[in-house]
Design a protein with these regions (language model features):
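Short amphipathic alpha-helix that is part of the acyltransferase structural core
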Residues: 1-47, 51, 56-63
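Short connector loops at helix/strand junctions that flank enzyme active sites
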Residues: 52-54, 67, 96-101
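Short, His- and charge-rich active-site/binding loops that engage polyanionic ligands
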Residues: 63-93
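Acyl-donor binding region in acyl/amide transferases
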Residues: 80, 86-173, 177-182
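Charge-rich, low-complexity intrinsically disordered segments
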Residues: 102-105, 170-210
Length: 210
């Protein structure tokens, strides 16, 4: 199983993956989680889905339906933690660097069986780290639920958490960062028996712009 990587400008190379990804995000964040965020016609997107610098990672099933996805924006561009919830940093200096990116909108189809759900999450996380490290990105910052932060710890990523969770709307969130170095992702490979590259590292003019 391989993970696709694309930007809005290169999404046409992957069939209907971009639209299918937006539908999955709507299913997870709007329908299931109840977030009040921009959406239309069963698709979710926001101001951080930018054609020039947002990168996407998706896993499609045999019917070309996206079952897992994640989003990455370098922190030298506008990103969620800095723009929307800087208080989650608890005084830590927020990065503004091409060597640090924010991972967001990571989700897996909730209708997948538990084992497949866990594997898809691990594989998508690993793909993002692999691509980032190959492109000079050394850390991911994130905003997530406390339970998801514990899941990152269980994956062996050893996240640095900036401070206690803060209630935003009806739920609590926290922020932190973790390394994208290959040594950080080794536990994921060991636990799930993943060997070799999980994503094709290639360059296209549209992809290297950001």
């Amino acid at each position: 199983m391989k993970v696709d990587h694309f930007t809005i400008l290169t999404a046409h190379r992957f069939g209907n993956a971009f639209d299918s990804m937006l539908r999955l995000r709507h299913k997870v964040f709007v329908e299931r989680a109840g977030w009040v965020i921009p959406n239309l016609n069963h698709r979710e997107a926001d101001q951080f889905d930018h054609p020039l610098w947002t990168h996407y990672f998706t896993i499609r099933d045999e019917n070309e339906v996206v079952r897992a996805c994640g989003r990455m924006v370098r922190t030298d561009h506008p990103y969620m933690l800095e723009a929307l919830w800087p208080e989650l940093a608890h005084g830590h200096e927020l990065p503004k660097s091409a060597r640090v990116a924010e991972g967001s909108r990571m989700c897996v189809d909730p209708d997948l069986p538990k084992g497949a759900h866990t594997y898809h999450h691990a594989l998508c996380t690993l793909a993002g780290m692999e691509w980032a490290w190959a492109h000079g990105i050394e850390h991911f910052v994130f905003v997530t639920y406390p339970s998801k932060a514990r899941a990152l710890e269980q994956l062996g990523l050893k996240p640095t958490i900036y401070g206690p969770a803060i209630r935003i709307g009806e739920e609590e969130f926290l922020a932190g960062h973790y390394s994208t170095a290959p040594s950080s992702s080794q536990r994921i490979r060991d636990v799930f028996g993943i060997e070799g590259s999980v994503i094709d590292i290639h360059e296209h003019e549209e992809e290297v712009a950001a």
